[in-house]
Amino acid sequence: MAYPFQLGLQDATSPIMEELTNFHDHTLMIVFLISTLVLYIISLMLTTKLTHTSTMDAQEVETIWTILPAVILILIALPSLRILYMMDEINNPALTVKTMGHQWYWSYEYTDYEDLCFDSYMIPTNDLKPGELRLLEVDNRVVLPMELPIRMLISSEDVLHSWAVPSLGLKTDAIPGRLNQATVSSNRPGLFYGQCSEICGSNHSFMPIVLEMVPLKYFEDWSASMI
């Protein structure tokens, strides 16, 4: 969940988001060390009075500043490739949900169940109840079982959209005529909010996403009541 004036990432709720948070910290530390080194060298150049006007080349220095950046790039690329593989790979999903973007709402279809589908519209500000969040609440939440791998198939009926839930580490483009895939998995129950993250028209800001992650038994009871 996001908070006012928040500067950091949202709390990780899925294994993928935990990996992304660790990778963010790993990369940020490398960037911080490089920036510190560069600023230190610049300060030395501005303050020292010693110069080497006769130096034409420095083979050792050139070797270092060629090899060192290559090593740094490898240290960044290896964990990045691992996370990319984890985000794309899904074996034996417990559930498949088809998500379609529209101007300006989402529709969901539980493909493992017959006739379990619905549209999800934003609740207008005037209809909100005490404690509900402005521009983030919907009339029909996506109820999913926690601690199970779930495959989301994402596409669009009209223009480009993007289905994003930050606390789960999800952001997948919804493209007309193309079916994209994302993996949803939550470590704990709760409500997780997202929004369309691709400018899709005048009401782009009014396409919220609400995932309600519940234990498997509650999900089975809910799905039985919806059919």
Swiss-Prot record:
Q: Please give the SUPFAM superfamilies that the UniProt record associates with this protein.
A: Cupredoxins (SSF49503), Cytochrome c oxidase subunit II-like, transmembrane region (SSF81464)
Q: Where in the cell is it found?
A: Mitochondrion inner membrane
Q: Report the sequence similarity comment from the record.
A: Belongs to the cytochrome c oxidase subunit 2 family.
Q: Which residues bind Mg(2+)?
A: E198
Mitochondrial matrix face of the membrane: 46-59
Protein name according to UniProt:
Cytochrome c oxidase subunit 2
Q: Which gene encodes it?
A: MT-CO2
Q: What does the note accompanying the cofactor annotation read?
A: Binds a dinuclear copper A center per subunit.
Instruction: Establish whether keyword Translocase is in the entry.
Output: yes
Q: Name one GO biological process term.
A: ATP synthesis coupled electron transport
What function is annotated for this protein?
A: Component of the cytochrome c oxidase, the last enzyme in the mitochondrial electron transport chain which drives oxidative phosphorylation. The respiratory chain contains 3 multisubunit complexes succinate dehydrogenase (complex II, CII), ubiquinol-cytochrome c oxidoreductase (cytochrome b-c1 complex, complex III, CIII) and cytochrome c oxidase (complex IV, CIV), that cooperate to transfer electrons derived from NADH and succinate to molecular oxygen, creating an electrochemical gradient over the inner membrane that drives transmembrane transport and the ATP synthase.
Give me the Mitochondrial intermembrane side stretches, as residue ranges. Answer: 1-14, 88-227
Q: Which UniProt keywords apply?
A: Copper, Electron transport, Magnesium, Membrane, Metal-binding, Mitochondrion, Mitochondrion inner membrane, Phosphoprotein, Respiratory chain, Translocase, Transmembrane, Transmembrane helix, Transport
Catalytic activity as recorded in UniProt: 4 Fe(II)-[cytochrome c] + O2 + 8 H(+)(in) = 4 Fe(III)-[cytochrome c] + 2 H2O + 4 H(+)(out)
Q: Which organism is it from?
A: Hybomys univittatus
Q: Which InterPro entries match?
A: CcO_II, CcO_II-like_C, CcO_II_C, Copper_CuA, Cupredoxin, Cyt_c_oxidase_su2, Cyt_c_oxidase_su2_TM_dom, Cyt_c_oxidase_su2_TM_sf
Recorded hits in NCBIfam families, A to Z, give: CoxB
**CDD domains tied to this protein:** CcO_II_C (cd13912)
